[in-house]
């Protein structure tokens, strides 16, 4: 049980910006909302089905047709995304399919949302960053991730800025190139990207139409030492932009699963998922995504995900999935953020900004005092994908997760764990080198502690190989 007094949080999750997760009803046999709950959030005209291995293609087609479905799309081995005919409800189709012997499982196509928050302020559009160390407390402050020393560590290892490691950002897209109505963010290098894909528009141009994905990618690999803007933690890593969320920051589980498999097949070493499903979505509701996450682990790809912003003592999926790094959010004061989920399965925390949670006995927490600063990065200053700056501070576990993804990229580049560390080795290293917070006794609030990029990339220590 969490030690947090949730009745005295400074700001409820409902006050987060529109990309905060919606509440979703749990499924029993069919997608029916629980009494008093918000209706389930899933695609209204499509479902995901997995057939048993021995089922013949003709039999699969007949089963789908009998359920009122058509236009099957292959998403994974033996798995199909089915479009429902007009007048056929998701519940009716699922009832028919779940009674068939050739169907392993059938589920709605649940939607996830970006796990970030935006608090408007009057900073003004397009203003210069000034001294990055004054603004980026999350990198160099007392409760930052110790970026300067981490940069020195990996430079000494011949891999400055995590050079060469590919990090896939599965999000709203990234402002990675200038073409048509889109413009590359002025604080991204044109050489900092590898080929991505847009699973919303179904083309090879994963442009951002929201700003959330550009922010996340900037925390990982913003151009650094270029006399402009801010810095990126793994500034020489390559970003693979994969668009799985639409302009509202929403995307279905099947789309996210496709994005995960794409990233694995195209050379990503780390995948960042700054998104969350509603707290009511369970593992049984998103089997295709869990299979994709297992596919990533089996191919040696580390997946990092946001723990969620509902101030609940439960980690949201996909962060809750096995072997996924679940990242909570901490504040500038070294306290758990008031919106951050916590509980069993939390791996560690990273800077997410905002106000302190009300944690009795934690000397770093002052829920009644001034809120800590938010996290800053260069992204859109409005709705136009051509205007950039630091429009306001973002806060959320979305902002926390890329700190961990970037640290993992630095570990890989440093070679401290060998040439190709496994996800399990990377997770063990991240946990073993984290800074203890809150007294260090109860992992339900902070996991192993605050991610420390310097300690994680230093020579020697847990799991290090002889040089």
Regions found by a protein language model. Give the residues of each.
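N-terminal secretory signal peptides that target proteins for export/translocation
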Residues: 1-14
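Bacterial N-terminal signal peptides
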Residues: 18-30
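Primarily auto-inhibitory N-terminal propeptides
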Residues: 34-131
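Generic structural signal for small/hydrophobic residues in well-ordered secondary structure
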Residues: 49, 82, 103-106, 150, ...
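Protease zymogen maturation seam
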Residues: 77, 98-166, 174-187, 197, ...
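Subtilisin-like serine protease catalytic core
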Residues: 149-195, 202-253, 266-269, 320-323, ...
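Extracellular S/T/G-rich loop segment that most often corresponds to the catalytic His/Ser-adjacent loop
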Residues: 171, 301, 319-413, 454-455
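C-terminal subdomain of the subtilisin-like protease fold in secreted/lumenal serine endopeptidases
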Residues: 264-278, 287, 292, 299-301, ...
């Amino acid at each position: 049980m969490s030690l947090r007094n949730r009745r005295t949080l400074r700001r409820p999750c409902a006050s987060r910006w529109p990309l905060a997760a919606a509440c979703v009803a749990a499924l029993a046999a069919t997608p029916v909302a629980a009494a008093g709950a918000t209706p389930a959030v899933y695609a209204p005209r499509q479902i995901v089905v997995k057939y048993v291995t021995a089922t013949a293609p003709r039999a699969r087609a007949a089963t789908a047709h009998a359920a009122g479905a058509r236009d099957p799309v292959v998403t994974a081995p033996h798995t199909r995304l089915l479009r429902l005919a007009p007048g056929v409800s998701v519940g009716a189709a699922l009832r028919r399919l779940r009674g068939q012997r050739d169907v392993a499982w059938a589920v709605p196509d649940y939607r996830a949302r970006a796990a970030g928050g935006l608090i408007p302020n009057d900073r003004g559009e397009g203003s210069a960053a000034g001294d990055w160390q004054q603004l980026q407390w999350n990198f160099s402050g007392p409760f930052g991730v110790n970026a300067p020393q981490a940069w020195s560590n990996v430079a000494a290892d011949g891999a400055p800025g995590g050079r060469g490691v590919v990090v896939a950002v599965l999000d709203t897209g990234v402002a990675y190139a200038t073409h048509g109505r889109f413009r590359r963010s002025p604080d991204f290098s044109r050489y900092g990207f590898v080929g991505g894909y847009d699973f919303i528009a179904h083309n090879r141009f994963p442009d951002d139409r929201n700003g959330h994905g550009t922010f996340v990618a900037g925390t990982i690999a913003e151009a650094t030492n270029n006399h402009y803007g801010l810095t990126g933690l793994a500034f020489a890593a390559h970003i693979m932009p994969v668009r799985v969320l639409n302009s509202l920051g929403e995307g279905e589980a099947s789309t996210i699963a496709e994005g995960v498999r794409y990233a694995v097949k195209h050379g990503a070493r780390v995948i960042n998922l700054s998104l969350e499903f509603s707290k009511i979505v369970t593992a049984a509701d998103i089997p295709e995504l869990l299979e994709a996450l297992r596919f990533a682990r089996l191919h040696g790809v580390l997946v990092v995900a946001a723990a969620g912003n509902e101030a609940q003592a439960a980690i949201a999926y996909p962060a809750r999935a096995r072997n996924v790094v679940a990242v909570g959010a901490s504040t500038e004061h070294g306290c758990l953020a008031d919106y951050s989920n916590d509980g069993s399965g939390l791996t560690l925390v990273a800077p997410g900004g905002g106000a302190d949670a009300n944690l009795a006995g934690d000397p770093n927490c002052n829920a009644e005092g001034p809120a800590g600063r938010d996290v800053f990065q260069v992204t859109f200053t409005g709705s136009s994908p051509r205007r950039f700056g630091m429009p306001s501070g973002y806060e959320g576990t979305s902002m926390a997760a890329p700190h961990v993804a970037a640290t993992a990229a630095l570990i890989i580049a440093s070679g401290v764990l060998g040439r190709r560390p496994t996800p399990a080795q990377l997770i063990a290293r991240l946990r073993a080198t984290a800074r203890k917070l809150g007294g260090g006794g109860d992992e339900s609030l902070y996991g192993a502690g605050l991610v420390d990029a310097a300690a994680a990339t230093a020579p020697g220590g847990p799991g290090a190989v002889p040089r």
